[in-house]
Swiss-Prot record:
<keyword id="KW-0770">Synapse</keyword>
<dbReference type="GO" id="GO:1901653">
    <property type="term" value="P:cellular response to peptide"/>
</dbReference>
<feature type="disulfide bond">
    <location>
        <begin position="379"/>
        <end position="862"/>
    </location>
</feature>
<dbReference type="GO" id="GO:0005886">
    <property type="term" value="C:plasma membrane"/>
</dbReference>
<feature type="binding site">
    <location>
        <position position="731"/>
    </location>
    <ligand>
        <name>Ca(2+) 1</name>
    </ligand>
</feature>
<dbReference type="GO" id="GO:0006821">
    <property type="term" value="P:chloride transport"/>
</dbReference>
<feature type="transmembrane region" description="Helical">
    <location>
        <begin position="608"/>
        <end position="628"/>
    </location>
</feature>
<dbReference type="GO" id="GO:0005654">
    <property type="term" value="C:nucleoplasm"/>
</dbReference>
<dbReference type="GO" id="GO:0015111">
    <property type="term" value="F:iodide transmembrane transporter activity"/>
</dbReference>
<feature type="transmembrane region" description="Helical">
    <location>
        <begin position="520"/>
        <end position="540"/>
    </location>
</feature>
<keyword id="KW-0217">Developmental protein</keyword>
<dbReference type="GO" id="GO:0005102">
    <property type="term" value="F:signaling receptor binding"/>
</dbReference>
<keyword id="KW-0869">Chloride channel</keyword>
<dbReference type="GO" id="GO:0034605">
    <property type="term" value="P:cellular response to heat"/>
</dbReference>
<feature type="topological domain" description="Cytoplasmic">
    <location>
        <begin position="679"/>
        <end position="725"/>
    </location>
</feature>
<dbReference type="GO" id="GO:0005229">
    <property type="term" value="F:intracellularly calcium-gated chloride channel activity"/>
</dbReference>
<dbReference type="GO" id="GO:0015705">
    <property type="term" value="P:iodide transport"/>
</dbReference>
Amino acid sequence: MRVNEKYSTLPAEDRSVHIINICAIEDIGYLPSEGTLLNSLSVDPDAECKYGLYFRDGRRKVDYILVYHHKRPSGNRTLVRRVQHSDTPSGARSVKQDHPLPGKGASLDAGSGEPPMDYHEDDKRFRREEYEGNLLEAGLELERDEDTKIHGVGFVKIHAPWNVLCREAEFLKLKMPTKKMYHINETRGLLKKINSVLQKITDPIQPKVAEHRPQTMKRLSYPFSREKQHLFDLSDKDSFFDSKTRSTIVYEILKRTTCTKAKYSMGITSLLANGVYAAAYPLHDGDYNGENVEFNDRKLLYEEWARYGVFYKYQPIDLVRKYFGEKIGLYFAWLGVYTQMLIPASIVGIIVFLYGCATMDENIPSMEMCDQRHNITMCPLCDKTCSYWKMSSACATARASHLFDNPATVFFSVFMALWAATFMEHWKRKQMRLNYRWDLTGFEEEEEAVKDHPRAEYEARVLEKSLKKESRNKEKRRHIPEESTNKWKQRVKTAMAGVKLTDKVKLTWRDRFPAYLTNLVSIIFMIAVTFAIVLGVIIYRISMAAALAMNSSPSVRSNIRVTVTATAVIINLVVIILLDEVYGCIARWLTKIEVPKTEKSFEERLIFKAFLLKFVNSYTPIFYVAFFKGRFVGRPGDYVYIFRSFRMEECAPGGCLMELCIQLSIIMLGKQLIQNNLFEIGIPKMKKLIRYLKLKQQSPPDHEECVKRKQRYEVDYNLEPFAGLTPEYMEMIIQFGFVTLFVASFPLAPLFALLNNIIEIRLDAKKFVTELRRPVAVRAKDIGIWYNILRGIGKLAVIINAFVISFTSDFIPRLVYLYMYSKNGTMHGFVNHTLSSFNVSDFQNGTAPNDPLDLGYEVQICRYKDYREPPWSENKYDISKDFWAVLAARLAFVIVFQNLVMFMSDFVDWVIPDIPKDISQQIHKEKVLMVELFMREEQDKQQLLETWMEKERQKDEPPCNHHNTKACPDSLGSPAPSHAYHGGVL
């Protein structure tokens, strides 16, 4: 076990850094086998190392790339390339010996006329030299390339040799396939026949990928151990660790390797944050299109997954996991399961919508509203400028409301609640199948938490705190006599000098209190801004309705409600899209000032803040229409006003459900079309164009020729960096809310979500394969905090749909009328029952219509939708008993619906096991086989040991003869008695 302050404690070999003058490499007799850095200048440079996927020798694969900016000399394209390796104390600037990394066109000419560098560039160079020297000590092999087609950018290629891969795989407890293979239990009887038929039917939509084919055999996996290498299939060491695993191992080393010149920073994240390196990423396997492109996993993913032409096919999830890692594989697997589950929901939603269309002409309430013979005169919708109007003018709205406000929507709400529970259970079972296939059954998140290193910002804050503390201690020591100092304390501090700074000093809640307070105030302020914008849109609707009512055109006045609703929803949509981007940036800033210690903690806090703000932003306008519009209007003669000027708007005679449907559909479709698709396509293309134009300006005149010959790492550098899965999950979670929360008002929501997701899967796939740098593979066994958010939305959906059916729709008032007030057991007279009467002489001063004869006759009594006493009653305009009866029925429905659906959802959760039975059996079988494997290994060892001991014992025993008979066995194999002699008797 070797301990080095510049590298984490790991078993490793002692290594030395060879100093090589590339200009005179042969003079010192350097051999490739003598050191970590192998000279590759003897290789034909025209081979171009398979376009940057390998070192210059064409054998060692590039596992990772570090990118940095440098200033080129004015007269020459090449730069001196050095890596410092010094035994001086950490932080010292003295260079013991300088040596170059192997690379193209390296030179060590002292008189090369290198331009003077400023302090910051010089400091970054020294940090890079020390860090790369420490990487060499960790066992990695490096090769530098500054003679690139990108102006002012240098690349460090990193290769992990076999011994480093084995060491790190053991440290990371990576499960690797062993030689032992076993049969996967197959279904029998009827199930086997059904599965075979389904496989034949679905064969055209299966991706042509080897990893996607049904497997009958599986290799037993076990955490890699160098002591048990004989258990693993090491016949081909080059392919034993695939590119994903190799890059993960190198990234772990990069995170742990220290750089003391980076102010005690730990790992590549700190160096990236400080600008020492511009980027760090693993390479893609090669090109994905074009002629004469070598076949690779990236090309296969593009052809079978990332093209819009294969939208009808299943996703090759196993290949996605193999190339991008488990975390990204789980995201696409979850998205695929969610999209698949939307199919039955869409079918049922279409049936519900068609039922509304089929029964539209049979709906008695809408027929009564459209019947002009009823001659129902309604009260004005606004003060002064609005006049009386006929209820029959709202016929189209009433008929359209029946499409979404019918008994089938209640059934659909119950169905969608059970659908959400079934979807969650189905995903858990799918997740367990993937865990089994991907050898994650024994993987625990705690194992990753142990290796989760502090973030660069956290280390910087800890350093700042420690420096302040040290300065305060110095001030105190000035006033304390030297002889009174505690020598034991000094010894302890000296002993702790090798301990990481983040272990000695930690940030407490007191250090973070200002950030917590800022978070609280900012989030409250952002929510208040959202409410204020919704209020502004409400005022717009009211004022616009009043302005349109003054229009002389009859067509404009007849379509006031539709015009105002549509324009207001479009304004809401634009504001929501803009605020989504703003809130995303604010949530990230608020999370940064909290300074979470690890990336996992940072991600969880960011998700919570972003989801809270975006949830409020997306759903506040919908909540207003669903639960508040028309509830606090007042009555004619006693209306409620905003700012004493704007009268609260009312719902249409058919209710607010139709308006809620319009609001929900426009916002949902608009967000999906603009934010999720156009932004995802347009913004990366725009960034790519900007990078191309910058490169064209900075590059020499032969730019077009240079582009043709770019290395793989140069091409990948121009791709967009991977920013995490949070935006991808967030848009799908918000969509899931639209599908479940208000599905009672919009049965077609699952259909539009399905159509969007079919495009979304291929859009995200194409982005990952063609537009983004290859992300570092991250192990994960579930989707993390997103699962809890989904469950929370599913529970909230039951409550919200109960209130939508009960309070927003007319379902409960119709039931109450049918069973309590109807004289003939039909809905005839329901519309008249829901309307109250108002005497126009009771209008407040200045609120009566300016043109009371607009309908051609004088109006004495007008009607309005409410349950109140008539003007001829003793308690005129007071709330009637009918109101309380309907309210009691509504509350009772909410309680019954909520508890019944919750019980049914929990029952579904209980009935469906989380782990499929066959997977449970296979996991148990793996454990038994693993125990048998080790038992057999121990038996073989014991037998081998006994055989060896027997041979050793036989070597030590003297041969049997007439002179020594004590050790000679008899015919039965037992030693002869001591008194017996051969050839004689006593």
